[in-house]
Amino acid sequence: MTTLTRQDLNFGQVVADVLSEFLEVAVHLILYVREVYPIGIFQKRKKYNVPVQMSCHPELNQYIQDTLHCVKPLLEKNDVEKVVVVILDKEHHPVERFVFEITQPPLLSISSESLLSHVEQLLRAFILKISVCDAVLDNNPPGCTFTVLVHTREAATRNMEKIQVIKDFPWILADEQDVHMHDPRLIPLKTMTSDILKMQLYVEERAHKGT
C-alpha cells in the first residue's frame, strides 16, 4: 500500500477523468429516466458493464460535454463540492435536484493495480441506482427542462474565470429560483467511499409538482 499526495502521478487528473466520464453518463441517464426529453433521442449503450441510455441529440450532447469540460479542471484541483442536475418546470422552477456531493481526500492510500477497477464497481452501483430512481420519485409535469449547477469552494472563483476565457463557455451565477426549493423531500440514493473519492447522491424533490 502506497501513500501519495494529490500531486503525485497527476492523480488529480486521473480522478477528474473518472469523475467527468461518470457524470456525463449520469446526466444522460437522469434525463432519460425522468423523461425530460423524448425517449426516441436516446440509444442503449454499455458503460461500467451495465446498459445505459445516452442521448443522440448533437446539441444536447454538446451542452453536456461543454459543461463537464469546464468542470474538469476544477475537479483536478479538488475545487468542486457539488454537481447538481436541476430539472425545471415550464416556469423554470425546480421540481427535482439530483445532487452529487464530491469529496476527495488530500492523501491517497492506494494499490494502483486495483484502484480504478474498484472505483468503477462503485460507480456502476450509482448508475444502477439512477436507473431505477423513478420508483421512488413522483412524475414530473410535462415540458420540463434542465440545467447543471456546480457548487465550488470559494478559492475556485479565480480558476473559473480563467476557464471561461480559455473555453469560451461562460459560467453564470445561478439564479436563486434555480437553487432554492421550499421544503423539499430528500431521497438518498447512493453513497460510496474509496481511497480516492467519496461521493453521495441524493434527490431533492418538490412536494407539489403540479402534474
From Swiss-Prot:
This is Mitotic spindle assembly checkpoint protein MAD2B. PANTHER family: MITOTIC SPINDLE ASSEMBLY CHECKPOINT PROTEIN MAD2 (PTHR11842), MITOTIC SPINDLE ASSEMBLY CHECKPOINT PROTEIN MAD2B (PTHR11842:SF10). Residues 13-203 form the HORMA domain. GO terms for biological process: cell division; DNA damage response, signal transduction resulting in transcription; DNA repair; double-strand break repair via homologous recombination; error-prone translesion synthesis; negative regulation of protein catabolic process; negative regulation of ubiquitin protein ligase activity; positive regulation of DNA-templated transcription. One of its GO terms (molecular function) is deoxycytidyl transferase activity. It is found in: Nucleus; Cytoplasm, Cytoskeleton, Spindle; Cytoplasm; Chromosome. Adapter protein able to interact with different proteins and involved in different biological processes. Mediates the interaction between the error-prone DNA polymerase zeta catalytic subunit REV3L and the inserter polymerase REV1, thereby mediating the second polymerase switching in translesion DNA synthesis. Translesion DNA synthesis releases the replication blockade of replicative polymerases, stalled in presence of DNA lesions. May also play a role in signal transduction in response to DNA damage. One of its GO terms (cellular component) is spindle. Keywords: Cell cycle, Cell division, Chromosome, Cytoplasm, Cytoskeleton, DNA damage, DNA repair, Mitosis, Nucleus, Transcription, Transcription regulation. Changing residue 171 to A: Loss of function in DNA repair. Homooligomer. Interacts with REV1. Interacts with FZR1 (in complex with the anaphase promoting complex APC). May interact with CDC20. Heterodimer with REV3L. This dimer forms the minimal DNA polymerase zeta complex (Pol-zeta2), with REV3L bearing DNA polymerase catalytic activity, although its activity is very low in this context. Component of the tetrameric Pol-zeta complex (Pol-zeta4), which consists of REV3L, MAD2L2, POLD2 and POLD3; Pol-zeta4 is the fully active form of DNA polymerase zeta. Component of the shieldin complex, consisting of SHLD1, SHLD2, SHLD3 and MAD2L2/REV7. It comes from Gallus gallus (Chicken). It comes from the Eukaryota. The keyword Lipid biosynthesis does not apply.
